[in-house]
Amino acid sequence: MAIKAEEISALLRSQIENYESEMSVTDVGTVLQIGDGIALIHGLNDVMAGELVEFHNGVLGLAQNLEESNVGVVILGPYAGITEGDEVKRTGRIMEVPVGEELIGRVVNPLGQPIDGQGPINTTKTRPVEKKATGVMDRKSVDEPLQTGIKAIDALVPIGRGQRELIIGDRQTGKTTIAIDTILNQKDQGTICIYVAIGQKDSTVRANVEKLRQAGALDYTIVVAASASEPSPLLYIAPYSGVTMGEEFMFNGKHVLIVYDDLTKQAAAYRELSLLLRRPPGREAYPGDVFYLHSRLLERAAKLNDDLGGGSITALPIIETQAGDISAYVPTNVISITDGQIFLQSDLFFSGVRPAINAGQSVSRVGGSAQIKAMKKVAGTLRLDLASYRELESFAQFGSDLDEFTASKLERGKRTVEVLKQDQNKPLPVEHQVLIIYALTKGYLDDIPVVDITRFEDELNHWAESNATELLNEIRETGGLPDAEKFDTAINEFKKSFSKSE
């Protein structure tokens, strides 16, 4: 076959004309030192603060310390394969995580990568992890209740949508249980929940995920897990990743509940990173900006005004104390940032009062505006009753001669404590809470033995579901308190069929 020279030259000419020279210029640096999840890099002179850099094996790092001769980078992943002299290149982008509806029902790490073995997450939307909090004029005051389903909280320390309410207490006092119960109670409420597990055992995270799955709560929940075995940088960024995922829903007019479990471990991880980066230590060896670490996170929880869609993020940060010391550095910081705290006491927990909420030291700075009218009316005197009972209880230990008024106060107090007890993973609808608290405050439980109170409440709830549906529906739908006559009739009717124990 004859090859024509003209055809070859024409073909070559067309190929050369269509050739585009593509070159990309990237800043490249060299690893000077590596260890404990920190790398010192020489040569990345133009790197931005918080920029992602890429190591030769594909592992990413976060530029934290920008110094004259080197850059301190925290490594977001395994660093065993990185050695001195390795090449590092800039990516030109700051850290982002995937966001969107596709994340609901999944368990992801702080980088947004799935760790539940259910395949990739098909979302193309991302948001930067570090973002300025919503401005003052874009917010609205908190005026809408977020029902936790826990009587002691909804009655005494109510939480509103857009609020930051701290859960604080020693280890093993039921902090996570309160948070999980609140997530369970958001079923059918149109709230997206995000549970951020920081520095917990893998087995604990797995147990909590299973609890949510069995209750059907994973249908509206995202779990962000940075377990104890992960490098410190992942524990440090986990809460920011969680709130970034939540902001996507908030700016689309939805309500979000986010739980940070717990910020003590995040602060410890940040302290570790700061000391390794040779930043000067301050009180309790924490760096000087540990307040800003938590304030910039918690300020991102907000209730947006109606022009921006009226969405909200409600934050429940958890802090673990040592021997009830709430005056330590991190607890005092977070107490000053949040809109109130739920203080759990180990003494109460071990004496069988669960949830072990200390009503005297717990407070909600939003208060009554985060309660439905019915609850506000029936629970108005509850805190004072409980406080006076605790005071009288300590005096009553010293003498047996009590006047009738004091004795009746003590008896009412015992019943109040009993009513506020609640089993875990059994959140109670607000209409049932109003019913039992009305019965308590109006004296209907005064003639019921203390040992029967829990049974009385359970049976009253079952009875009301079939015999007082109008009353319950009115509370649920209007939020107002029905006529006292309706309550009195219903409770008296039930008491006729209730049998006290001998």
Curated annotation (Swiss-Prot):
Q: State one molecular function term (GO).
A: ATP binding
Q: Name one GO cellular component term.
A: plasma membrane
Q: Write out the entry's keywords from A to Z.
A: ATP synthesis, ATP-binding, Cell membrane, CF(1), Hydrogen ion transport, Ion transport, Membrane, Nucleotide-binding, Translocase, Transport
CDD domains from the UniProt entry? ATP-synt_F1_alpha_C (cd18113), ATP-synt_F1_alpha_N (cd18116), F1-ATPase_alpha_CD (cd01132)
Site entry: Required for activity: S362
**What compartments host this protein?**
Cell membrane
Catalysed reactions listed for this entry: ATP + H2O + 4 H(+)(in) = ADP + phosphate + 5 H(+)(out)
Family as reported in the entry's similarity comment? Belongs to the ATPase alpha/beta chains family.
Q: What is this protein called?
A: ATP synthase subunit alpha
